[in-house]
Amino acid sequence: VIRNLLAATAVLMIATAAQAQEPARGGPATDVPLLPGAQLAADCGNLLSLSGSAFCVTAPLGEIGTLADAYIADLETRQWLAAGGDDNRVVFVKRRDGGGCDGLQMQAFYDTSKADVTATDPGYLAFATIPGDICAAQPASPAAPPAAAGTVPQ
């Protein structure tokens, strides 16, 4: 049990560091179910250029937080660990059987171009994979060039 906790902690620390920047978007997450209260939004509301690159669902904006919590709980039952993110995005990691980690991100959004947004306006959740092994070691910073022969290091 302690070994699993240590491994999970290490995964979270590595993934958080790896995801400090906006992660690259892979393709739509294909294993995310349509939970109660969500409706499929194949075009992702034609917002954020997500159509075709993410699996999107919609619900009234006033309910999107509760729906996001339900998706987080559902993903946790399938071994996805919340590892980072920001105000409107959660990054998840999942250990691969052969080593390394898969990444998934959930982003909440709505149409910010509207002047008067209400709780009944559509809110969206987009799910997309993060390409590559997100637990892979980050490249080390380049070493300082060696001092030229005959010079005194400073």
PLM region spans:
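Bacterial N-terminal signal peptides that target proteins for export
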Residues: 1-9
